[in-house]
Regions:
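Histidine-rich, glycine-flanked metal-binding segment
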Residues: 1-51
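C-terminal cap of metal-dependent C-N hydrolases
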Residues: 8, 342, 352-383
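Metal-associated gating/positioning segment near the N- to mid-region
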Residues: 45-105
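Divalent-metal coordination cores built from histidine and acidic residues
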Residues: 81-163
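Conserved, mostly hydrophobic/aromatic
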Residues: 127, 183, 213, 321, ...
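Active-site core of metal-dependent hydrolases
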Residues: 154, 158-280
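His/Asp/Glu-enriched, well-ordered alpha-helical/loop segment
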Residues: 233-242, 260-272, 278-364
Length: 383
């Protein structure tokens, strides 16, 4: 027999449904109804809102786990379970620019065992690199940066059992257009970033099939009135998604607002770019091969002081854009769930409350603070 969630409002892609009940059937979402059968079991969240579980499509680590360490038990358990306390129920473990062999080993482990994740569900693998440009290397190792090669990608995808569903590259690398055209034709999402590309170079990559901008504004050629660069292309080119880190450190809130106005909330995917120190205390950590200092809400390279990923919680990024008065609660929820899922073509399994989908959802209070996280209709985290 189904049970029912009672709440003040429910966040759907098309808008907010107020009152009523959401049916749960065998761990799946059912219908939204106004009346329920007599004697039905009710999960009462009167005074609260129900939103889809959040989807983090760019995250390198959490809780002491770094995806690049290839500690598969840590990724499957420590990281995936820890993310439930962040409101995240689906994620893409994200790599860094590294050697062909190390990336092969990481993908092989995740591809073989991703279904064993005991918390947030692994919905794919995101390769952030290695086909980047040294000038905008960020916290990535330029020693491994190079032009894209189909033989490498094929080997990684085979090792991943087809789970590699997103890869980021710099549009100005040699052979990008053919590479992008080929892999997007196979359903892989191509993101553009860590790049010194001109507007025209970026546009050619988008015309070939690229559709996401990596951590907007960061690691990309800026806009001037003579050369629009990557930022100008991100603003101007339609039907593309911009990843956005809303921690108040990576991007000024006003710049976030400009981007949202340029692209529309439906084309913004909130991400964390979180590294191993997420959920932990300030101190010294590693991001891949690089020593990092975490303090005052940021993670920075010891060598240069440059930002090195973040320690942002996705639930806080959602709340920030509302507190900054640049998005409504419904828009913010969609930017942290439905939009990122759509951006990598996994909205057929997650990112929205929809009949037949896994009942992965979160409970929010009136201030958009996380109250609880559910997986398959079962409460897995209580604030």
């Amino acid at each position: 027999m189904p049970n029912y969630i009672k709440a003040d409002q429910f966040f759907y892609p098309h808008g907010v449904r107020r009152g009523g009940y959401l049916e749960l059937v065998d761990g799946k979402f059912g219908k939204h109804v106004e009346q329920i059968p007599e004697g039905a079991e009710v999960i009462d969240y009167t005074g609260y809102s129900i939103a889809p579980g959040l989807v983090d499509t760019h995250i390198h680590g959490f809780g002491g786990v770094d995806v690049m360490d290839n500690n598969i038990e840590g990724t499957l358990h420590t990281m995936s379970e820890g993310l439930l306390s962040m409101g995240v129920t689906s994620f893409l473990p994200t790599t860094l620019t590294s050697s062909y062999e190390q990336l092969l080993a990481v993908t092989e482990n995740i591809g073989a065992r991703y279904q064993e994740a005991s918390g947030a569900k692994i919905r794919g693998i995101y390769f952030e690199g290695p086909y980047f440009t040294e000038k905008y290397k960020g916290a990535q190792n330029p020693a491994y940066m190079k032009d894209p090669r189909m033989d490498e990608f094929r080997a990684w995808q085979k090792a991943a059992n087809g789970l590699l569903n997103k890869i980021a590259l710099a549009p100005e690398r040699e052979g990008v257009e053919d590479f992008v055209r080929t892999i997007t034709g196979e359903g892989v999402t191509v993101a553009l970033g860590h790049s010194n590309a001109t507007f025209d170079e970026a546009k050619k990559a988008v015309d070939a099939g690229a559709s996401v901008w990596v951590h907007a504004y960061n690691g990309m050629r800026g806009l001037t009135h003579r050369e629009l660069g990557m930022v100008g292309a991100m603003y101007q080119l339609p039907h593309t998604y911009a990843e956005l880190i809303c921690d108040g450190h990576h991007v000024d809130p006003k710049a976030c607002e400009i981007l949202i106005k340029q692209k529309g909330t439906e084309n913004i995917a909130l991400i964390t770019d979180c590294m191993t120190a997420g959920g932990l205390e300030d101190g010294d950590y590693m991001l891949g091969e690089f020593p990092v200092v975490v303090a005052n809400g940021t993670a920075r390279l010891k060598s240069t002081g440059n930002l090195a990923g973040s320690i942002l919680k996705l639930k806080d990024g959602l709340k920030n854009v509302v507190d900054w008065n640049i998005a409504s609660p419904h828009e913010a929820v969609m930017m942290a769930s439905f939009n990122p899922a759509k951006s990598v073509h996994i909205d057929d399994v997650c990112g929205q409350i929809r009949e037949g989908y896994d009942a992965d959802f979160i409970v929010l209070d009136k201030d958009l603070e996380l109250v609880a996280t559910y997986l398959d209709g079962v409460k897995r985290y209580q604030a």
